[in-house]
Amino acid sequence: MKDTLFNQSLNKRFCFDEKVAHVFDDMLERSIPYYYEMLDLGAYFIAQNLKENLNAKPLIYDLGCSTGNFFIALNRQIQQEIELVGIDNSMPMLKKAQEKLKDFNNVRFECMDFLEVEFKEASAFSLLFVLQFVRPMQREVLLKKIYNSLALNGVLLVGEKIMSEDRILDKQMIELYYLYKQNQGYSHNEIAFKREALENVLVPYSLKENIALLESVGFKHVEAVFKWVNFTLLVARKT
């Protein structure tokens, strides 16, 4: 279903309710440059890591899994038996995910606040365009919890919208991103109304800040494997 949610001002903060869930896949594809390519790229690195670590724990968590797109990408690339657990606090999103992945018997979804979940030991975690919605004071706590739950040689994927530390560059990057959204069919009003709804809800860090945060909780190897202007995909390994 086409995203027309912001044809007019919502007069409220953005939240992942039923209206958003109905159009979320279209919103993702038109709002995040190379969205599906990043999912495939992330799935590749997890699949390769599992191949090279034969004793890897057969469990992967996707936190803030929304409509389950990443698990579709993972199931295309992972050959061995693996348990996929998606956690999201939006039941409308999870209903969409369950519909899309009803034919996969290795997928389980839980409607919970992932900040309160006690994770089992896992071979991989993913936070794909999710950390930016976590309150800054809680991000380090969450990442430390993930790090402690990762098996040795496990990986964490972090996809994020980012900002530049240079004020002028940041303004230019945002302007280019808005041009991208216009080319995807969004009007000036839709872009402005969505920006208004996301203010103080989506709080981006710079690339350096995200990498420093990951390193501060224990990750020794953090790599930006993809970047387009103000979007990036990071792979962090626990060694």
From Swiss-Prot:
Protein name, as recorded: Carboxy-S-adenosyl-L-methionine synthase
Alphabetical UniProt keywords: S-adenosyl-L-methionine, Transferase
Reactions catalysed according to its record: prephenate + S-adenosyl-L-methionine = carboxy-S-adenosyl-L-methionine + 3-phenylpyruvate + H2O
Main EC class the enzyme belongs to: transferase
Record's function text: Catalyzes the conversion of S-adenosyl-L-methionine (SAM) to carboxy-S-adenosyl-L-methionine (Cx-SAM).
Transferase keyword on record: yes
Record: residues binding S-adenosyl-L-methionine: 35, 64-66, 88-89, 195
Family, similarity comment: Belongs to the class I-like SAM-binding methyltransferase superfamily. Cx-SAM synthase family.
